[in-house]
């Protein structure tokens, strides 16, 4: 097992990364009250809920559960309310802990619920997908979608502890594994060319679910995110670099309808668009773009999206949270392994990059 700490000034919390982690031993120091609400979904709960429930009950905790439907399209205010209903019906108080057992949607919703319930209760993350292990479970961003935009309602809510268990990735569908690899590739492209070389050497093993390679990929990804979050917890500056591919990707997700494409699939094509625009701006070479596309394809991810009318695409991009004073800011590549956030780009070139990476 490897342990990584996220340092946040006065606070810090551990991320435990390994296979067949023992929840009783690892969670005990981080569950402060007697009451624990496990939030999961209909896919994950039959696989792992009893394991965590029994571990917590053996510690003398009162455990209640809230099982939600599975999918991005349920990340909304109606389903958030179901968590509040469960907490209130169980009679839970301000010392309770909300434990997220699932992927990014469950983590986002359970975390947001924990931030709101009685103005904030304890939160624990047990991410069961690769995407949530390397991205959404680290750094405290929580929230839900609104019909007019993704993640428009939310809060920063740091967990007490994160348990990333590689054994849980064995039950992950191929598509979900690939979606997680998109975020792993993102860390390499935005800040670590050595990691990109490592991914190029080991991608076949990652796709084949080699537990040791996955643990290394999760550790290196989380270490990158932890460093950035430590410097910029509330996304005032550097943390926005973690959105490489996301402004384009969110537009794809929003147009196609949440859940049609997985978040990681949309981010993968978004990173291709960002690389394409970076090349058009003269920052990276054609070879760099080809290298970006190749590693994304080797992870079984899309490098182009269906045709989306340009006005619609740009409309969704305008809703992005990185818009400042009416100006769209994009995360682009100065070179592979070095991203920048910038508003200095030619909109016509951006349109070309979008259109060049759509298929009929």
Curated annotation (Swiss-Prot):
Main location as per UniProt: cytoplasm
Cofactor binding note from Swiss-Prot or TrEMBL: Binds 1 divalent metal cation per subunit. Can use either Co(2+) or Zn(2+).
Record Pfam families: DHQ_synthase, DHQS_C
Co-factor(s): Co(2+); Zn(2+); NAD(+)
Pathway: Metabolic intermediate biosynthesis; chorismate biosynthesis; chorismate from D-erythrose 4-phosphate and phosphoenolpyruvate: step 2/7
A molecular function (GO) term: 3-dehydroquinate synthase activity
Reaction(s) this enzyme catalyzes, per UniProt: 7-phospho-2-dehydro-3-deoxy-D-arabino-heptonate = 3-dehydroquinate + phosphate
Annotated Zn(2+) binding sites: 183, 246, 263
InterPro entries: Dehydroquinate_synthase (IPR050071), DHQ_synth_AroB (IPR016037), DHQ_synth_fam (IPR030963), DHQS/DOIS_N (IPR030960), DHQS_C (IPR056179)
Cellular localisation: Cytoplasm
GO CC terms, sorted: cytoplasm
Domain of life: Bacteria
Enzyme class: lyase
Keywords of this entry: Amino-acid biosynthesis, Aromatic amino acid biosynthesis, Cobalt, Cytoplasm, Lyase, Metal-binding, NAD, Nucleotide-binding, Zinc
Disulfide bonds: none
EC numbers for this chain: 4.2.3.4
Positions bound to NAD(+): 70-75, 104-108, 128-129, 141, 150
Biological process (GO), any one: amino acid biosynthetic process
Cross-referenced HAMAP family: DHQ_synthase (MF_00110)
NCBIfam families linked: aroB
Family of this protein: Belongs to the sugar phosphate cyclases superfamily. Dehydroquinate synthase family.
Job of this protein: Catalyzes the conversion of 3-deoxy-D-arabino-heptulosonate 7-phosphate (DAHP) to dehydroquinate (DHQ).
Protein name: 3-dehydroquinate synthase
Species of the source: Acinetobacter baumannii (strain AYE)
Origin organism lineage: Bacteria, Pseudomonadati, Pseudomonadota, Gammaproteobacteria, Moraxellales
């Amino acid at each position: 097992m490897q342990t990584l700490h996220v340092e946040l000034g006065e606070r810090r919390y551990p991320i435990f990364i390994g296979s067949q982690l023992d929840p009783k031993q690892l969670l005990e120091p981080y569950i402060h009250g007697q009451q624990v609400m496990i939030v999961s979904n209909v896919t994950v709960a039959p696989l792992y809920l009893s394991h965590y429930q029994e571990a917590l009950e053996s510690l003398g905790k009162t455990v209640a559960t809230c099982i939600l439907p599975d999918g991005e399209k349920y990340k909304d205010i109606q389903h958030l309310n179901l968590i509040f209903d469960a907490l209130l019906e169980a009679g839970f108080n301000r010392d309770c802990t909300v434990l997220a057992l699932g992927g990014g949607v469950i983590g986002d919703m359970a975390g947001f619920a924990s931030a709101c319930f009685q103005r904030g209760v304890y939160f624990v993350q047990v991410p069961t997908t690769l995407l949530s292990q390397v991205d959404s479970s680290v750094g405290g961003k929580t929230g839900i979608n609104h019909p007019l935009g993704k993640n428009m309602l939310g809060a920063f809510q740091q967990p007490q502890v994160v348990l990333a268990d590689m054994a849980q990735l064995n039950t992950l569908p191929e598509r979900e594994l690939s979606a997680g690899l998109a975020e792993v590739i993102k860390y390499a492209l935005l800040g670590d060319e050595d990691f990109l070389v490592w991914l190029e050497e080991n991608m076949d093993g990652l796709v084949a679910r080699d537990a040791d390679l996955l643990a290394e990929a999760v550790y290196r990804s989380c270490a990158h995110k932890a460093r950035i979050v430590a410097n910029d917890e509330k996304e005032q500056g550097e943390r926005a670099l973690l959105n490489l591919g996301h402004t384009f990707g969110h537009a794809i997700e929003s147009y196609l309808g949440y859940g049609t494409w997985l978040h990681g699939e949309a981010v993968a094509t978004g990173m291709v668009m960002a690389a394409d625009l970076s090349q058009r701006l003269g920052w990276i070479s054609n070879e760099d773009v080809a290298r970006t596309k190749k590693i994304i394809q080797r992870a079984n991810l899309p490098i182009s999206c269906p045709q989306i009318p340009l006005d619609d695409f740009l409309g969704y991009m305008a809703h992005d949270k990185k818009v400042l004073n009416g100006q769209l800011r994009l995360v682009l590549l100065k070179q592979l392994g070095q991203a920048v956030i910038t508003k200095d780009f030619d909109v016509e070139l951006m349109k070309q990059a979008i259109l060049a990476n759509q298929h009929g």
